Regions:
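C-terminal nucleotide
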Residues: 1-86, 101-132
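Short beta-strand->loop micro-motif that forms the acidic, two-metal-ion catalytic signature
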Residues: 95-101
């Protein structure tokens, strides 16, 4: 049995409730996304890496159910900001922080634009950390 076959069997195990099935699906698909993201970074394919970030967030939101409406709003707003390839929830879930993959030359401006859009949309302040 190959690894993908074993993963699919784990997802489809008849003993799993619907909730547990979604949790297993997230873990299996997230492991695949991590491997694909490493490959995308090695190939300097930031568009692909951004797509994988967005898919990761969708899985965290829908399958693992650890996102919040505020974080989901922030991720949606990020999709409209030029220079941001993708964004996802990070940390333990249930709010807190996102990590965004952005063009280096636009990172600070993109982060400020995102925080301003979030503040204007929700009334909540945001804090940005842009690595040097």
């Amino acid at each position: 049995m190959t690894r993908p076959d074993a993963d699919e069997r784990a997802i489809q195990a008849p003993v799993l409730s619907d909730v547990l099935r979604r949790r297993v699906r997230h873990v299996v698909s997230e492991n695949r996304r991590v491997i694909e993201t490493v490959s995308a970074f090695k190939n300097h394919d930031l568009d692909k890496a951004g797509e994988l970030f967005r898919a990761s967030h969708a899985s965290l939101r829908d399958d693992f159910e650890v996102s919040t409406s505020e974080i989901d709003k922030l991720c949606l707003l990020a999709e409209r900001v030029q220079g941001i390839y993708g964004v996802r929830l990070t940390g333990g879930g249930f709010g807190g922080a996102v990590v965004a993959l952005a063009e280096a030359r636009r990172a600070r401006a993109a982060a400020e634009e995102l925080v301003n859009a979030y503040r204007n949309t929700t009334g909540h302040p945001g804090t940005v950390v842009v690595p040097a």
